[in-house]
């Protein structure tokens, strides 16, 4: 345990010196990484849809075409999707290599194109034992969503069910006419803020109230440079964060780096964390926190 603790401490110190604001990892032990400041920030929702529950075809103007796994259109759709979604990894060449590392050779990619042949979505899948296995399904608008499900439903005679994973943080059942599909939620990726001061200063707050300051009192046993008090303020559209001395300031929000990460990443809302005694503050501060922090859950589907 001492060696692993030392290695993790060294890794954090290296990331801090490299000015990396946040660290992500897939945990082999959630309790272990929680002790070191990492926290769950995204879920994986595994779903099973029976063939009789597949959505009825909807009219769309485009079509779905199979493409190679290194298709530029396919990769470009993911890049655009990642830029739109909170917390999504923008894949470089190494990320794409890791994405395919553990998959079988039967994987297929199919892209939805508009009538102008503009790519707007894709599904990556394989079929085995009468099951349509979805590795990833991404769409940029509802037309692409309909088109991809039309494509999946077209395999009705070949399959008994569809299985896949959804990383949006929202259950899918509501969108099906027969909503009695099977969904299982599991914690997925963990993250931790590496540099609290920088993260608080560069964070995209929803509002920038010039007549208001918020005092974060942060606890971080693993990264001593984060332990302390931070005053966040706004002026002329800019955010400022300075480390201050511990005092009897107003608007204090006290929490550990785990909770700060989960809250700012949007995985859990401030009111939820307050109700479960994860943050210590005056009740009126919850209104401010709810207004400041964007309402959007992270989308993270990669593994490393």
Predicted features along the sequence, with ranges:
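Amide-forming acyltransferase catalytic core, primarily the GNAT-like/NAT-type
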Residues: 42-135, 142-146, 150-155, 187, ...
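Conserved acetyl-CoA pyrophosphate-binding loop and the N-cap/start of the following alpha-helix
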Residues: 2-10, 143-147
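Flexible loop/turn segments at secondary-structure boundaries
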Residues: 31-33, 119, 131, 170-173
């Amino acid at each position: 345990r001492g060696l692993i603790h030392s290695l993790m401490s060294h890794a954090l110190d290296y990331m801090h010196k490299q000015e990396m604001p946040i660290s992500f990892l897939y945990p082999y032990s959630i309790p272990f990484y929680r002790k070191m400041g990492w926290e769950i920030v995204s879920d994986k929702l595994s779903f099973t849809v029976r063939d009789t529950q597949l959505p009825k075809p909807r009219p769309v103007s485009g079509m779905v075409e199979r493409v190679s796994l290194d298709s530029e259109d396919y990769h470009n759709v993911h890049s655009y999707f990642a830029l739109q979604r909170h917390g999504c990894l923008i894949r470089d060449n190494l990320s794409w290599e890791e994405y395919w590392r553990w998959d079988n050779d039967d994987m297929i990619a199919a892209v939805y194109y508009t009538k102008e042949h503009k790519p707007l979505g894709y599904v990556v899948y394989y079929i085995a034992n009468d099951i349509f296995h979805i590795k990833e399904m991404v769409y940029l608008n509802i037309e692409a969503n309909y088109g991809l499900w039309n494509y999946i439903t077209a395999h009705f005679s070949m399959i008994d069910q569809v299985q896949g994973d959804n990383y949006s943080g929202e259950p899918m059942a509501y969108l099906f006419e027969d909503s009695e599909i099977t969904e299982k939620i599991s914690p997925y990726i963990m993250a931790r803020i590496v540099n609290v001061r920088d993260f608080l200063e560069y964070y995209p707050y929803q509002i920038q109230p010039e007549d208001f300051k918020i005092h974060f009192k942060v606890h971080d046993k693993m990264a001593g440079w984060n332990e302390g008090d931070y005053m966040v303020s706004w002026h002329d559209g800019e955010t400022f964060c300075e480390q201050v001395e511990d005092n009897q300031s107003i608007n204090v929000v006290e929490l550990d780096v785990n909770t700060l990460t989960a809250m700012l990443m949007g995985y859990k809302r401030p009111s939820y964390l307050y109700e479960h005694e994860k943050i210590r503050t005056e009740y009126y501060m919850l209104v401010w926190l709810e207004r400041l922090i964007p309402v959007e859950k992270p989308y993270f589907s990669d593994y490393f």
